């Protein structure tokens, strides 16, 4: 095999597969990527860890068709340091690959294509959803996925499409993130209900973050396929039964306090410095017109801070893991900063403004100090987004 490709093009596509390729694996070939020619002017780059696979395509001048397998990390480290221009690849005997760019020359050890895992064949993708919606779903839910590998069914997101509505739910057993959005009549033609691994979700964000188009996706009994801008991500489904999340969403929280998300986030960050290192617990005392955040450590001291809130009712104190609150407030703030712009007429002039412009305010809905609390963005009509947290004993 022999081909020539632009350094900038190769660097971009190699960057997408780095998060998939195993750097240290009991199966050595998984540290490699497969590069093969397709037709006269395209190469295909494939990386896999057997659970998640990414396949990219890039324009190249194919001198001789074929395939090569090269160590992924080493190749990426070399390519990103090369000068801009053409990079020439030529496969030699015994799977060695000669690589030149300007005055730079490299000779890389490769492995046979026959040793590379077979990539699942891509099925037709009957469903489409805008990349913006997919990224918003993942950004607002992925943080609540458990990091405990033993809790297999909680190590991904439940993704549902039914009744012209898309929904994503995640939980680690202590908190739950739920988001849904009504779709247009022509957005989905088939229902779906699947568990998607966290790693696949995060890689999907990477390959679709800068896309203004749609993500096409479909499934077979074992895999889910996502395609965006010519890049394909294939992931194994998680097996098992996801918890009945509808039972967790509170139905009788009769008290609501509304506060500024940024003010609360900053206050919790400061006060939590004095929280117990093991539980990270802070207490929120909700009173008319304010919420007081407090934390204490028997060994280090204590701290408190007040945040203004729209609330009229009896005083209630609730304990929380401070990190759970910060995770939610962080993604709400990030979503507001990245909100899309729309054109509006003002005094006869067309101006571009952010949707939901301004500092986000949080609706904090609770019943008492022992029942789960629900938080959502006040006034958000684009998405039905809920975050439910179990309280701590204080």
Residues covered by each model-derived region:
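Structural preference for solvent-exposed beta-strand-turn elements
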Residues: 1-394
């Amino acid at each position: 095999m022999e081909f020539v490709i632009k350094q900038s093009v190769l660097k971009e596509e190699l960057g997408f597969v780095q998060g998939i390729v195993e750097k240290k694996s009991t199966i050595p070939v998984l540290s490699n990527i497969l590069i093969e020619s397709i037709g006269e002017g395209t190469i295909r780059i494939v990386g896999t860890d057997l659970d998640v696979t990414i396949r990219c395509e890039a324009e190249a001048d194919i001198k001789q068709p074929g395939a090569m397998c090269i160590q992924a990390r080493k190749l990426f480290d070399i390519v990103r340091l090369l000068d801009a221009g053409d990079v020439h690849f030529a496969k030699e005997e015994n799977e060695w690959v000669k690589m030149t760019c300007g005055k730079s020359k490299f000779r890389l050890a490769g492995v046979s294509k026959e040793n590379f895992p077979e990539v699942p064949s891509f099925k037709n993708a009957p469903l489409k959803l805008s990349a913006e919606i997919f990224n918003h779903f993942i950004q607002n839910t992925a943080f609540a996925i458990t990091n405990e590998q033993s809790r297999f069914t909680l190590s991904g997101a439940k993704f549902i499409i039914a009744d012209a509505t898309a929904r994503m739910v995640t939980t680690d057993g202590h908190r739950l993130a739920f988001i849904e959005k009504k779709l247009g009549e022509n957005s989905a033609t088939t229902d779906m209900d699947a568990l998607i691994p966290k790693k696949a979700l995060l890689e999907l964000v990477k390959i679709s973050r800068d896309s203004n188009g749609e993500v096409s996706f479909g499934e077979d009994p074992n895999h889910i396929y996502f395609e965006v801008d010519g890049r394909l991500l294939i992931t194994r489904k998680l097996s098992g039964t996801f918890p009945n999340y509808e039972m967790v969403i509170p139905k009788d929280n009769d008290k609501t306090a509304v506060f500024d998300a940024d003010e609360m986030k900053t206050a919790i960050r400061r006060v939590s410095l004095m929280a117990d290192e093991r539980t990270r617990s802070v207490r929120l005392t909700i009173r008319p017109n304010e919420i007081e955040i407090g934390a204490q450590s028997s060994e280090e001291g204590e701290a408190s801070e007040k945040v203004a809130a729209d609330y009229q009712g009896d005083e209630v104190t609730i304990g929380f893991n401070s990190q759970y609150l910060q995770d939610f407030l962080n993604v709400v703030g990030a979503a507001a900063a990245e909100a899309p712009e729309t054109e509006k007429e003002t005094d006869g002039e067309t101006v571009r403004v952010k949707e939901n412009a301004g500092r986000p305010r949080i609706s904090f809905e609770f019943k008492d100090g022992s029942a789960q609390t629900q938080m959502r963005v006040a006034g958000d009509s684009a998405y039905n987004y809920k975050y439910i947290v179990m309280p701590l004993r204080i």
